[in-house]
Amino acid sequence: MNRVLYPGTFDPITKGHGDLVERASRLFDHVIIAVAASPKKNPLFPLEQRVELAREVTKHLPNVEVVGFSTLLAHFAKEQNANVFLRGLRAVSDFEYEFQLANMNRQLAPDVESLFLTPSERYSFISSTLVREIAALGGDISKFVHPAVADALTLRFKK
């Protein structure tokens, strides 16, 4: 069985992330969205909420599960019996970092391959950072995130 691990902070999960998950769900038997705790990034949403939002966005996909983690990615991949890391590349600027990460992961988990997918053109400009900035300034984010995510962002910035 091919099990792909799609790691990220997902703060928040966007339609771009959702697009990659949908496409991966057609390519792999099982897709694991691995939501990283990432405390050094100082996420807007706590891990539990990011996991719940990702579950809401992907609940229509029966072969997708969402799991939070706070360990080394290579170790987590082994725990999950994953044989592929999935990473999205929006632009050439993403490639250098992702290339270094893939090589490091290969050293730490040689049995797990890295696969890069580019997003659909309509999502290639979306990033969680931009979505957070637009939401913080009261802008319309409905084109970029699932309604549940938009609601969570609206509530978060009303405080």
From Swiss-Prot:
Assembly and oligomerization: Homohexamer.
EC number: 2.7.7.3
Biological or metabolic pathway of the protein: Cofactor biosynthesis; coenzyme A biosynthesis; CoA from (R)-pantothenate: step 4/5
Designated gene of the protein: coaD
Cystine residue pairs: none
Cofactor(s) of this protein: Mg(2+)
Cellular component annotations (GO), alphabetically ordered: cytoplasm
One Pfam family in the UniProt entry: CTP_transf_like
Top-level taxonomic group: Bacteria
Location(s) in or outside the cell: Cytoplasm
Residues that bind ATP: 9-10, 17, 88-90, 98, 123-129
Keyword Cell inner membrane part of the UniProt annotation: no
Catalytic activity: (R)-4'-phosphopantetheine + ATP + H(+) = 3'-dephospho-CoA + diphosphate
Residues that, per the record, bind substrate: 9, 41, 73, 87
InterPro entries: Cyt_trans-like (IPR004821), PPAT (IPR001980), Rossmann-like_a/b/a_fold (IPR014729)
EC class (word): transferase
Gene Ontology MF terms in the entry: ATP binding; pantetheine-phosphate adenylyltransferase activity
One BP term from GO: coenzyme A biosynthetic process
The protein's name in its UniProt record: Phosphopantetheine adenylyltransferase
Keywords: ATP-binding, Coenzyme A biosynthesis, Cytoplasm, Magnesium, Nucleotide-binding, Nucleotidyltransferase, Transferase
